[in-house]
Amino acid sequence: MNTTIRILLSFCFLNLVGAALAQPDSIVLRDINWDKNAPAGMNELFIPSSGATIAGLIYRANGVQKHPTLIILHGYPGNERNLDIAQVVRAHGWNVIYFDYRGSWGSGGQFSFANCVQDVVNVAAFCKKYTDSLRVDTSNIVLFGHSMGGWVCLKSLAQLPGIKKGFALSTWDIYGDFKDVKTEQQMMERARQGGNYFVLNTPLQELFKPVVDHPSFYKIQNDTTALASKQIIMLDEHHGNSELADTLRRSNRNYFNYEVWQTDYPFTNKRISLINKVLAFLDK
């Protein structure tokens, strides 16, 4: 084979590889070459949160330096944990922290939607306190939440001035689902539609009564001022959050992206596209 043909074939091959890498529905992963002094790994975390202890874990990135860190917030009750995202993000050079809110999946304390938000604030404080041992770069922490975790992501992002980015996936608009409820019977009928989970230690009546009694706290639109300077992605599989997204977009002075994909609630057929969107957001 002469030199000209070799060069031409090499050029074609590189173009094909480049095109494949550019596709949003493909991803290239490589095994991690362990740093002998600080290899990538995983550790359990026991995090104090308002007098209780919540269980979590950290996927440690490779290397002795402090790493940017993604905090993953699960939904209600949290069957989809998005740990496939965690593995790829860790390989991308980031730490990833996953935890179970108070009163969920064996964590101590009482489960409530408001407590979930405060738990994120407490996890961020934990990262700051143990920044050296956890090797967390506290200047670059990003929140990612799914369903209820999307709501928690936006609510806690509004309370954490040091965290600049949030990715809300299929956000549960808790306020929107209960704003027209007039009686306790209506509230319980609506609450039961979401299931009654033994992995959450709060009865439905106690869990949802604050939503009806104090709706302003649960209304994300009331946090537009605090969220105006943040970088936010909202990604849905339905159009139910379009009004909320429009409100946040109009007030945002930094970066706001809202998309609706043709998929299901856990984004089953779009995992690679989702991971690529997360990575691009982390790198932004």
Question: Could you tell me what each predicted segment is?
Answer:
Residues 205-278, 283:
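Serine-hydrolase catalytic core
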Residues 23-64:
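N-terminal cap/lid segment of alpha/beta-hydrolase-fold proteins
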Residues 24-25, 158-206:
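Hydrolase active-site cap/lid region
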Residues 75-88:
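The serine-hydrolase catalytic nucleophile loop
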Residues 134-147:
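Alpha/beta-hydrolase fold nucleophile elbow
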Residues 89-108:
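Conserved alpha/beta-hydrolase
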Residues 66-75:
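Short beta-strand element of the alpha/beta-hydrolase
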Residues 111-134:
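Alpha/beta-hydrolase active-site loop
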